[in-house]
From Swiss-Prot:
SUPFAM superfamilies: P-loop containing nucleoside triphosphate hydrolases. One of its GO terms (molecular function) is GTP binding. The keyword Nucleotide-binding applies. This is ADP-ribosylation factor-like protein 13A. GO terms for cellular component: ciliary membrane; motile cilium; non-motile cilium. Belongs to the small GTPase superfamily. Arf family. Keywords: GTP-binding, Nucleotide-binding. It comes from the Eukaryota. SMART domains: ARF (SM00177), SAR (SM00178).
Length: 395
């Protein structure tokens, strides 16, 4: 029994001597599921409890590694503190909400900036496509295509792996195994380059560096060189964030201007359509098209003889006296009704219509008081036929 206990104790000491201390930071946008991921790590992997109250720091024991996991917030203020932990981390876990397609462009910008940072370039990165349980979640192949991971990996010389996962508490453990598989891959990639990564690891620890609200606890001050480096990095990140905010604001203003112009065009078009449907008088339309309109006139037509034969007047050609005497000087006037309003104003005026000739003999015979002049008319019937006059319309 003593030998058995001695063998177990010696084996535990050898295992503790081989354990490697690894620091990993978990980052991503807000509401991507980072806190649920760390909770899943604690459920699936044995963890080591600390006496200090550090809710954002978790220590895991997996294989031959003692892993310190730091959960960093993903809001705008929390992202400003990310560069303070790049140099201390051996590897990174980047959590992506695969169901939020609207923010995939924002994820692309942040991940590109992260991988091109000198303190992160060359370090292994595990990308977890979280919330795969949702209906519209993107597949890992789609995420690789959207984020252009192949180009980023080739340019930054960083190892990268995309693993689908879901961090729901009620999900069975067998469906949460991709989380453990991804973490094992990350630790194996760190173990292959552990010595190289440790040389890049700066002497101050994470607890000493942190002075923000993300990680609690008081620590020592950083060295002047590391502080100046971080100050330059923070200034650059502030400039980049200011530039991105300005670009986003300009793009939003451009989109609003386009919507305003489209709305104005639609309203003007509706106004023109409404005007075309409204009833308008005909006169302005015709005057606009160049038509000439004549005013209406109430015209009367008078029928009359061109020449009135008086008593004792003879024929001009023969010279014989005319003894015929008209019984009365009646003029046959008839008034035509005024043209109606519906008459076509644009028709040409009709030519004067020639009326059939009237025989004076017939006129006198119809007159009862012309009996006294029958003899004269009978004697000069041939002459009177020549003296018949024509009637015209006079306007």
């Amino acid at each position: 029994m003593f030998r058995l206990l001695t063998a177990c104790w010696s084996r535990q000491k050898a295992t503790e001597g081989k354990q490697r201390n690894v620091t990993i930071i978990v980052i991503g946008l807000d509401n991507s599921g980072k806190s649920h991921l760390v909770a899943a790590f604690q459920r699936l992997i044995p963890s080591k409890m600390h006496s200090e109250m550090r809710p954002t720091q978790t220590t895991l024991l997996l294989d031959d590694y003692q892993v310190s996991v730091y959960d960093l917030t993903g809001d705008l203020k929390g992202r400003e503190k990310w560069p303070n932990y790049y140099a201390e981390a051996h590897g990174l876990v980047f959590v992506v909400d695969s169901s939020d397609i609207a923010r995939i462009q924002e994820v692309k910008i942040i991940l590109t900036r992260l991988m091109f940072d000198k303190r992160v370039s060359g370090k292994p990165i595990l990308i977890l496509a979280n919330k795969q349980d949702k209906k519209d979640a993107l597949l890992p192949c789609d995420i690789i295509e959207y984020l252009l991971l192949e180009r980023l990996v080739n340019e930054t010389k960083s190892m990268c792996r995309v693993e689908p996962c879901s961090t729901i508490r009620n999900l069975p453990k067998r469906h949460q195994q991709p989380i453990v598989i991804g973490l094992r891959w990350l630790l194996a990639a760190i173990g292959d380059r552990y010595d190289e990564l440790c040389t890049r690891h700066q002497t101050p620890s994470m607890s000493n560096i942190s002075s923000s609200k993300n990680i609690r606890g008081c620590g020592e001050r950083c060295s002047s060189d590391s502080l100046s480096t971080r100050g330059v990095g923070v200034v650059r990140n502030n400039h980049r964030q200011h530039f991105e905010k300005r670009q986003h604001l300009e793009h939003r203003q451009h989109v609003e201007q386009r919507h305003f112009e489209k709305r104005q065009h639609f309203e003007s078009r509706q106004h023109l359509i409404q005007r075309s449907l409204d009833a308008r008088p005909l006169k302005p339309i015709l005057q606009k098209d160049g038509f000439r309109i004549r005013p209406k006139k109430n015209m009367s037509v008078t029928f009359a003889l061109d020449v009135i034969m008086e008593e004792g007047e003879c024929s001009r050609k023969i010279g014989a006296p005319n003894i015929s005497k008209p019984c009365n000087s009646q003029c046959y006037d008839t008034k035509t009704p005024a043209p109606s309003a519906d008459a076509n104003l644009f028709k040409a005026r009709r030519p004067k219509k020639r009326i059939e000739t009237w025989d004076t003999e017939e006129m006198f015979l119809e007159d009862p008081r012309g009996e006294a002049f029958r003899s004269c008319v009978t004697g000069h019937s041939s002459r009177s036929s020549r003296n018949t006059q024509s009637l015209y319309f006079t306007g």
